[in-house]
Amino acid sequence: MTESMKYVAHGAGGEPQVMHMAVTDVPAPAAGEVLIKVAYAGVNRPDCLQRSGRYPPPPGASPILGLEASGHVVALGEGVTRWKVGDLVCGLANGGAYAEFVAIPQGQVLPVPTGLSLLQAAALPENYFTVWTNVFQRGKLQANETFLVHGGSSGIGLTAIQLAKAFGARVICTVGNEEKIRACLAAGADLAINYRTQDFAKEVMDATDQKGVNIILDMVGGDYMQRNINCLSVDGRLVQIAFLQPSKTEVDWIGLMVKRLTFTGSTLRPRTAADKAQMANELHEKVWPLLQQGKCLPVVHQVFDLTEATQAHELMESSTHIGKIMLKVAGG
């Protein structure tokens, strides 16, 4: 196997144009890690934040961008028993996926679901780990509950819509134009609201006979916070996973007390390897069968070559995409 590899470097950080191709050593898999020859890598908003210098990798993580990849296993670290060389896999990386090879802890690696391509498989880890841990583990979404997801046409949004419907929930989402409304309805949403032309809180209350929704998955923050409180039901849950608006805002907490609301949230990357392995096990048991049955499928908006990472980040930051933005490395 080659000793060097190409990867996307981003120097000290900045705008998308700072990214460029460079060469470095192929990482040696540490104990408990598998080395994957990357077929495709997913592009996620945390990649853009890291590139711009606003989201440094946690201690010990690869400084190379990229949090998810698919490909085949080419080497095993000491103590790896779950995988063998040649296995087709996808994985949640701690960093390093914008490269020809990436090392990932074995517990964060999953088989490519039967019937899915390597491209589709690379679009799974970041979104499915995020939605599973936040909507189902922390938010405790149940069948017959009503679920509101903001950013419904994003990769996370479309994943949340599909999974919530597969588990029997009613789904409402917010998006910014008619094309995105159509995409969300096609993914299974019961109602899609254009937040640019409608007051989503009023629309939600009207659609729920003034009862509100049981759970909200929010990645916007800012002035959405008060409106989220206003349209949650009694005993409702708000799960915050990102802030596209400022993270500091002013709210009236009376609604939280009167409705007995629960606020929670999480970030995925800093979680321990044990946490991520537990998430992976649950996904393999409860969600991978749905993927193999075609009940949930990733939506890929556009595929760029690894050398076109700048264009991929520009598209991500434009927020005009629907679904996942992907990078082709070896392909397949």
Set out the residue ranges of the language-model regions:
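C-terminal capping/lid region of NAD(P)-dependent oxidoreductase domains
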Residues: 2-5, 288, 293-302, 310-332
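Glycine-rich beta-strand-centered segment in the early N-terminal region that forms part
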Residues: 25-42, 54-96
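Mid-domain Rossmann-like dinucleotide-binding core that forms the NAD(H)/NADP(H) cofactor-binding site
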Residues: 122-124, 128-197
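NAD(P)H dinucleotide-binding glycine-rich loop of Rossmann-like/cofactor-binding domains
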Residues: 18, 82, 88-151
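Glycine-rich phosphate-binding loop and adjacent beta-alpha segment
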Residues: 175, 223-295, 328-332
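N-terminal Rossmann-like NAD(P) cofactor-binding module of classical short-chain dehydrogenase/reductase
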Residues: 90, 148, 193, 216-217
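Short glycine-centered segments of the SAM/dcSAM-binding site in methyltransferase folds
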Residues: 88, 146, 170, 236-237, ...
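Short amphipathic alpha-helix with an adjacent loop that forms part of the alpha/beta core around
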Residues: 200-210
